[in-house]
Amino acid sequence: MRNKLNFQNIEHSYAFKELSKLPSIVSSKQLRTNSIFEAVKPELKNVQNDIQMFYSVIEREINSEISQIDLVETELKKSLKNVNKSYAKIMKRRTILSSNGKNKNLAIVDDFNKEVDGLESLITGLKETVHDMIDDLVTADSQLKSNNKSVTKEEINSQHYPLLFEILQKDYNHIFKESNNLSVQDADRKSIELDIEDRTEVKSSDDKDSMNKNINIMPIEDNSITHLSFEGEPIYTKVSHENSNQVTDKGINQLDENTLNQEIKNDNLICQRSLPPKNLSNENVVNDNYADSNCLKEEKKNEVDTSKSKMGTINSTPSSTTMGNGFILPNLTKVVKPTISTTFETVVNREF
């Protein structure tokens, strides 16, 4: 008896499935060279276009770099030409200066140094001149009296002459110490006082009061008067402003009727002060604010010769007392208490 064989189909096998996935074999015509080139021709064309584009860009950049290099080279050539030209000029100038043996720049520096030396010598000369002038000023000021000195530490002097006192305080500080010592010695020398008290009775049609005068005279040596002061309380006689101006250098000239009728019983001093103020001497006047003053005795005719006075000061101080008949101050208010301080240096006659 025969055995039956069982045949197994591969259609459902794994190998058959994998084989069926493979593409079918192309024909032999497609595997030829021409067919292959025809298939890749588009891609080859794209590659060619890309290569041409890259080449054009690179070529353009290279040309730009070349043009810039050419421009830089041209500028460098010009600069080199200028450098060579300048170098040639410098060498030529150096040769000329070396041959002449003189450097103009050094000559200019030497001239400048000479000018500076001249200015320094001029400044030194000016300083010496200023110091000589100050020495002369200090010498002249030292010969004056202490109350007439200008080179002192008073603030008003330094305000008028700030530069002068700055130099004095810097280089001549010892002068202020010497001036202070001299003023103390001068005050001690003038300590002698002579007190003369005199009483004057003045009769008037309107007033019957008496006037007391205290006359203090301070004589010193060398025939000079240093201080003359009058303090009094005159009787109350009104004098008009018009008539008060009519006082001359010889005494009372024209006043009102009450004043013209008065009698001076005692031979006391009658002092006038006329305005505007005048200098006692037109040549040797130190203080500007002093006025012409004559002190006379009516009967004895003893007078101070003001024409011989060299310098002096008169100060009048108003108060709240009216003027009297025995003492007239023109151009002042009628409500005053006359106080006169007179300073002379040299007076020919000082007998009272």
From Swiss-Prot:
Keywords: Coiled coil, Cytoplasm, Cytoplasmic vesicle, Transport, Vacuole. The keyword RNA-binding does not apply. Residues 299-308 have a biased composition (Basic and acidic residues). It is found in: Cytoplasmic vesicle; Vacuole; Cytoplasm. Residues 299-318 are annotated as: Disordered. Residues 57-133 form a coiled coil. GO terms for cellular component: cytoplasmic vesicle; vacuole. The keyword Coiled coil applies. Residues 309-318 have a biased composition (Polar residues). Component of the biogenesis of lysosome-related organelles complex-1 (BLOC-1) composed of at least BLI1, BLS1, CNL1, KXD1, SNN1 and VAB2. Belongs to the VAB2 family. Component of the biogenesis of lysosome-related organelles complex-1 (BLOC-1) involved in endosomal cargo sorting. This is Biogenesis of lysosome-related organelles complex 1 subunit VAB2. It comes from Vanderwaltozyma polyspora (strain ATCC 22028 / DSM 70294 / BCRC 21397 / CBS 2163 / NBRC 10782 / NRRL Y-8283 / UCD 57-17).
